[in-house]
Amino acid sequence: MFADKLHPFLDRYDEISTLLSDPNIANDIEKMTKLSKEQSSIEPVATAATKYLQILNDIEENKALLEDAELGELAKEELKSLEISREKLEEEIKILLLPKDPNDDKNIFLEIRAGTGGDEAALFAGDLFNAYIRYAELRGYKFEIVSQSEGNTGGFKEIIVLIKGKGAYSRLKFEGGTHRVQRVPETESQGRVHTSAVTVAIMPEVEDSEIEINPNDIRVDVMRSSGHGGQSVNTTDSAVRITHIPTGLVVTNQDGKSQHKNKEAAMKVLKARLYEMQEQERLAKETSERKSQVGTGDRSGRIRTYNYPQNRISDHRINLTLYRLDAIMAAGLFDEIIEPLITHYQAEAMLEAGI
């Protein structure tokens, strides 16, 4: 019975509440912090479980009244309402019981790179960047550009943005992968549709304690900053390139006002990339074991197609097609795709967990 799965959470919540009121525990800051954190993580389930068990109790009470001459009809109507509430709350609890992604509440580094398609790919990278920024603004997230390399005719060859806001990773983690665009470039005189692509990486911002880099494993090169067209923008060598020797990862930053700022920003991106690399290795291992349909950042996988002539946007992981590409891109309405992706992931996770 579903209710049986809830009692351990309620028992543990009550146990923690008792422990937190113990004067001996109150004097142990480390233990107090650990218990408070556990209580916060259990509280949503405990609160919902209490409501659920009360609904079950109300259902039984109303069932007992069905044969009553005066209250039978009223009990029948009440049972209908209670059953609807029970089903809705049960689904909510199932989602709460799913293992929480430890990165979900983190800020993210959004990296967009032009792929096949040359200048047109760079232009689309710019369009996608603008759409994501509109999405970030809709959700109340803050953002700052970490580094950028502009395309020859506009857009970006590469741009990295730090997006700050609670739950940023949980909303955008499914955006990682290859985004294909089909449209007629402005420079196309014959009206032919060209296909190009950009790759998107979503990397959680990591704390210094989460990933350590041996100073001997990196090489830091200082260069002259360059602006549009490659011209020098100052007289100091402030641009920084950091190479992580064991992996070959290279991060360059020149957007800060000083060498120190550029090095600090480059190190943050490097840590995020190394963390992402570790996550990809872990996910690859898990995926090989359970063949998950929805990836959470595989750069190699083609996840979405943007077809401008048809005003169509298709997400290939869940076979979702919407004919409102113009509105989604113009207003950053990515939740129209993200919500179905989250629902799909949750259903898949419930199936695996046997919930």
Curated annotation (Swiss-Prot):
Keywords: Cytoplasm, Methylation, Protein biosynthesis. GO terms for molecular function: translation release factor activity, codon specific. One of its GO terms (cellular component) is cytoplasm. InterPro entries: PCRF, Pep_chain_release_fac_I, Pep_chain_release_fac_I_sf, Prokaryotic/Mito_RF, RF-1. It holds the Pfam family RF-1. It comes from the Bacteria. Belongs to the prokaryotic/mitochondrial release factor family. This is Peptide chain release factor 1. It comes from Campylobacter concisus (strain 13826). The lineage of its organism: Bacteria, Pseudomonadati, Campylobacterota, Epsilonproteobacteria, Campylobacterales. The gene is prfA.
